[in-house]
Amino acid sequence: MGIKKRSFLKKGLILGLSCMMIGSTVTITSAAQESKSLTEFANVLDVSADPKEAIYGTYSTNEYNNFSDLGAWHGYYLHDKSATDLYGGFAGPVIIAEEYPVNLSDSINKINLEKITAAGIESIDLTKATTQEIYYPGRLEQIYDLKDLTLKLKLIFGTNRTALIETVIENKTDEELKLNVSWDGHLFTYYTNPNNKMGTTLTKENNGIRVNFETIRSTWNYMTTEENSFDIVLNEDDITTEISDDLLSYTITRNEPVVIDANSKYETYQTQSFTYTTDERTTEKQNVVDLLENPNKYFEENNNRWQGYVDTIFENKTNVNENYQKAAVKSIETLMTNWFSPAGAIKHDGIVPSMSYKWFIGMWAWDSWKQVVATTYFNEELAKNNVRALFDYQITSDDTVRPQDAGAIIDCIFYNQNEDRGGDGGNWNERNSKPALAAWAVENVYRQTGDKEFLKEMYPKLVAYHNWWYTNRDIDQNGIAEYGGMVHETCYDWTGYGYEIGQVVEGFGTVNDQGFVLDTNGERIVCPEAGIEAAAWESGMDNATRFDREGNGPDDKGIEIYTVRNDSHDPIGYVINQESVDLNAYLYAEKGFLKSMAEELGYKADAEKYTKEAKQLQEYINENMYDEETGFYYDVQTNEDGSVKKLLVNR
């Protein structure tokens, strides 16, 4: 059955893009007009910067926004007007040291011009120019307007590893203009503070330079290997490259002057590539050849792609309030900058919450579903692949680490897996899942694209994930789920939550030499703080007061942890003593989405099953989780066997 595509703005998802809020609507009436040009959306997102080694500003967030595209793992800024030492090049780049943003330079490559006349050589001072620094959707531009010439720089991403830069010098005079042309750049030596050396050096390459990296595995700050490489390649044949003795700065000089006829122009191009492995670098070298041989093709394709994004969201409806238009474009720019292509353990393209925040260069089973719904309106393949990226690591029954969690989607994935998986990453998290929004995301992709093959691909995976909630997160098996956590080492380590070896913990026991507390059967007990933290993270609400251990008021016994067991009495997870209304509302909606998918795929029995289950869950929520006096829904406190229930109106 064909699915009619929905209008992006007409359905009011413009605010959903920027805020990622479910259910926000904006009523807009509009008529077809000419499409909006990309040049009408200059600098709707501020990427101006004067980047430094100490990249972070407030809350471990990059002090400046940057631009990236196509899933590249590096990005650029426009220089601040006041940062005149950066004139002549694009500020940056910022690279992702596998999981962390780092400024490689304040300007890795700047052009220098000298005017040659009969009277001698005159250095051209770009700080005397009238300048424009512009971020259009999909590209950065700089314009330096001087008396005799205009210098124009444009930057786009040509591939998911390479930026393509166009340099145009226009002779504004009626006479021939002769110029000496060179480029220079340098490396930062440390990240965050002077004690953290980046281990980078420069070497000469054909038609350019290479930044070499050392193997540095700082789990929580900076992770590189000797295979990493940042390469600059110019489409200039006759050049001389000089590198400083400390291998941190360089100059590339054209051996012959550039001669520009009256009222004519000179064009040249370069690429800047950041790759993680030798194989990536080899592949990208071939891509660079094509980029430099056919630059106009790539600039045209880039413009068409971004114009397509804008045309799709407006669907030629351009009399929408200007602020809403800008918000929509700004949202797309944000999503595309946060697009990351396969690298390391990440197998499919996806979107991270923020390229700027230190701890957010990964993909979460929570943020991703919302990003998928937004992205499917203008980049359908990226939306599909973002779903796949998380399901690539869906737990299976033959998993070597946690087969008891078959069906689960783990909390988040990063470039590096954790030690249990043979990696050395610290951010990869399998301790908990996230709220059940995956089916909602897939349903939205299908309704937007009509791709039944994608629906067939995802349906059994979604069913397995849905079932997991009822095998591993339902302590009394009443069909009502609770938030909790996986069987995970961090949940048993009491010393990680402020307890000391030998400490007697009232109601639990003594912390042994391994940091564990054992019950009378010798089984490890989940540390309450660890268990509550995992459950709170699983909710997506993290530090919400509804998860305070002490509860609220004299009649509230607070949070307790219950172990969920299989038929062999083996632990397969744990939950808190709360049937959460939000989780079960998500699961109710998910049953509806699964019913709809089953109908589309012709699975009649499944459709009937989910219809029945949804009705039962709806009745439970309305009868047991709603308080008529206050007019709100609340969580229900439960004991382990489900014989005692209490509506938590006090929270």
Where are these regions (language model features)?
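Hydrophobic core
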Residues: 17-25
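Terminal accessory carbohydrate-recognition/targeting modules of carbohydrate-active enzymes
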Residues: 31-323, 358-359, 366, 377-381
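Conserved oxyanion/phosphate-binding beta-strand-loop segments in alpha/beta enzyme cores
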Residues: 124-136, 314-358, 397-404
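Extended, well-ordered alpha-helical scaffold segments
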Residues: 283-309, 323-330, 379-392, 452-470, ...
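Catalytic cores of carbohydrate-active enzymes
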Residues: 301, 463-498, 585-651
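Well-ordered alpha-helical scaffold segments within catalytic/enzyme domains
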Residues: 311-320, 369-382, 437-452, 585-604
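Helix-terminus loop motifs that line ligand-binding clefts
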Residues: 344-350, 363, 379-495, 622-636
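Carbohydrate-binding/catalytic loop surfaces
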Residues: 347-362, 404-431, 479-575, 630-651
